[in-house]
Amino acid sequence: MQALIEISDKQYLVKAGDKIFVPKQKAAAGDVIEVKTLMQVNQADSALKAGTATIKVLEHVRDETIIVFRKKRRKRFQKRNGHRQHMTQVEVLSL
């Protein structure tokens, strides 16, 4: 069974046992969180229903570096910045 869950205004299509990266959550590593499911899809009877999903916070990490490069032509102005977004890895325990 798959479910469409919403975490921090983003939607993810997951099933039990999946590990996904989501925007940083305030929960500590090892905590269990309940999130709402927008829709559960069961291939056997094609039933659509809402409910809750249980996820476990595995760790807090930082995403890959995104390079931001700005340049003004003919003025010898160049600026290069890097940005790393904070992410949380979670595991879906049950739907």
UniProtKB/Swiss-Prot annotation:
Pfam families: Ribosomal_L21p. InterPro entries: bL21-like (IPR028909), bL21-like_sf (IPR036164), Ribosomal_bL21 (IPR001787), Ribosomal_bL21_CS (IPR018258). One of its GO terms (cellular component) is ribonucleoprotein complex. The keyword Acyltransferase does not apply. This protein binds to 23S rRNA in the presence of protein L20. Part of the 50S ribosomal subunit. Contacts protein L20. This is Large ribosomal subunit protein bL21. It comes from Chlorobaculum tepidum (strain ATCC 49652 / DSM 12025 / NBRC 103806 / TLS) (Chlorobium tepidum).
